[in-house]
Amino acid sequence: MFILKINKLLSVLFLSLILHGNSFAQLSKTDVDKAIDISSLEHPYLYFNKSEKKELLKRISEDQESNDIFRKLKAQAKVWMVMPVDKNIPIQGKNTRANWSEEDRNGKYSGYYKTNLDNAYHLAFLYQMTGEERYAQKAFEFADAFCDLTTWTQRAHEFPVIYSRIMPWNVPDDQVNFNFDHFNGDAGRMMAAVYDWLYQALSQPHRDRIRGALLEKVVTRVRGDYEFHWWATAYRCNWCGVCNSGVGLAGLTLLKEHPQLTDIVAESYNRINSMFNELGEDGGWQEGGGYWNYGVHTSSFFADALKRLTNGKHNLFNNKRLKDNPVSFPLYLSLPGNKSLNFEDSGGYGLIGSPHLINKLATETKNEEAAWYRSNFLEKGDNIFDIIWPRPSSLGVPPKNPSKHFRTIDWWVMRTDFMNPNKVIVAGKAGKNDDPHHGHLDIGHFVVYWNKEYFIRDLGRSGYDEKYFDEARFEYPEAASSGHNTILVNGEQQISAKYYKQPYDYSIGGEVLSFQSSDKVDYVLMDPTKAYPNKELKKWRRSVVLKKPEVTLVLDEIKSTSNAEIKVRFHPGVEVEIYEKLVMLEGKNGKMALIPILNQKFEINQGRHTSQMVNGTEKFKWIDYFDIEVNSRKEITNLITLILPVKDFEEARQIVAAKSMKIEKNGSIKINLVKGEDDFEFFFEMKKEGLIYKK
């Protein structure tokens, strides 16, 4: 009996590891030593070797996309080849995110940093593709200037600016060492390639110049000291991938001279694998799309190099969480008009994923949805890695359902079609308020996107000043719940699960209770109750229904004391006209009406957030919103909001006049409305826990 119990326990533990995606054992230095034949290595070897270079040259010759990238690079090199390389390092400002001084504002240091690094990198690649040593010598001039920098870490991430930042998940609060940041990780990754690509053309002193810089500014800052770097265990943070990739690639490129560096190669593998394990079971990433891209993109360079050097034995692309859903997140967050959902600090200004990254993920995982995303959404490549990592051979196959619930992070997207801008997209999120790094207090929030515009929007991120990552971030409207399309009861706002040097409270947040999708209707039910202190808001359930392709209905069930002031907040992304019984939203290519449906008196009132970055040059701005306001008459208040396209105000007025709401004795609710020749019915059945939408 005892043995049976032990076997059962071991089976459960094994299953939980597999389900979580932790499909690899920890890699040791010995494992790497056995897998890489260091004696056979000959530069270049990170991303291609001498033999494989022939295939790249053939691709440049025969593939128009690759040929265009290469010809553009050669044309740009005409400038770089005659550009003087300035050895006078500009002064770096002490507060580059506050812009107090001229050095903070002028951008000379960051320009110097970027120019020398980028030019060395691209000229080194040109040398490999042409064999012309003039490119190698000029690349070294830029590399030499970059190596002369005292540090490759930038001021915004050094003490004392970053000291007061709230530490992310799995990171101890007591952090005082900040000598390696994501800029340093990027620099390590790129300079590792410069060393690899220039090696054969350089004299020993020139090789040693770059080798010494990689050791001084990358390897010795981290090797043996991982416990003193906060990002080393921040597996839900993009920094983990960026920094570990840079360190690992520095180790790989220096293996001939320093074979002992297989220890940091193993460390990078293990830590990046742990980051990949934190991808959601559907591919979601809590920080948002932009930071999914940064972490996965930079990690893919290390993953590719290590896979090559170990002949596929140690392949991070086989991580279960990554392999099962390599591009689900960027695909489902995509919006017509070359945009993406901008929840959290993720930006949303373009589609997610560099073409070469999606090429690589699609090829390595053989995922047809990834190939379809590459061939149907992204533009032509314009990066040297679009030559090294070419398009997948398949054009791919679209997902069967364009709607998605990312279960691990509880984000959701409801839509009729990926490509058609004339069909409404509704998206929102629940989940936990436990990402103090890039998360917002936005549980229960949603947006409405149509005709390439947000009609109901997310404010996106604030500019990154010196306080935005401190506890003060939750006072910025961009991060506070008051700056999202949520509920306020007597002004009560959502709270964070993590504050500065305080323990996490993982109970704070919300959840998706139900997500259903079909050809004709999508439905989500969220419970954001525990995102609040619950002194005023006792309970909140939000149902969102999309009757495809364009009619959205939102039902908010709010429990509070009687006579509480309840506000349903909306942030418009277009022009707004407030009327007594409805709101007109006018975009560039169409109009929508937002119509409250209530059985009690309500008001629609406009307001404005104040928004001011802590920055000497950033201007103050107002941010518009409007509220549907009611005073609760009893413990439970039901507020219904209809959002749909209309021709004009007259059609909206007719919809208001024809709508009806019936509340049955058991509390079930039926809403009927007419739009033109179409009739719509929404029925919510009362259950023990609240109202449930029934098709």
Predicted features and spans:
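Carbohydrate-active enzyme catalytic cores, enriched for enzymes
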Residues: 254, 291-455, 513-521, 631-634, ...
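Solvent-exposed loop and edge beta-strand segments that line ligand/cofactor-binding
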Residues: 29, 45, 98-116, 155, ...
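Low-complexity, Ser/Thr/Pro/Gly-enriched N-terminal "stalk/linker" regions
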Residues: 27-103
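Bacterial N-terminal signal peptides
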Residues: 11-20
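Active-site lining segments of carbohydrate-active enzymes
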Residues: 172-290, 386-400
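Long, well-ordered core segments of solenoidal/helical folds
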Residues: 73-87, 139-157, 209-230, 263-283, ...
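Well-ordered alpha-helical scaffold segments within catalytic/enzyme domains
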Residues: 43-64, 117-134, 138, 144-151, ...
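CBM-like, beta-strand-rich accessory domains located in the C-terminal region of large
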Residues: 25-26, 467-695
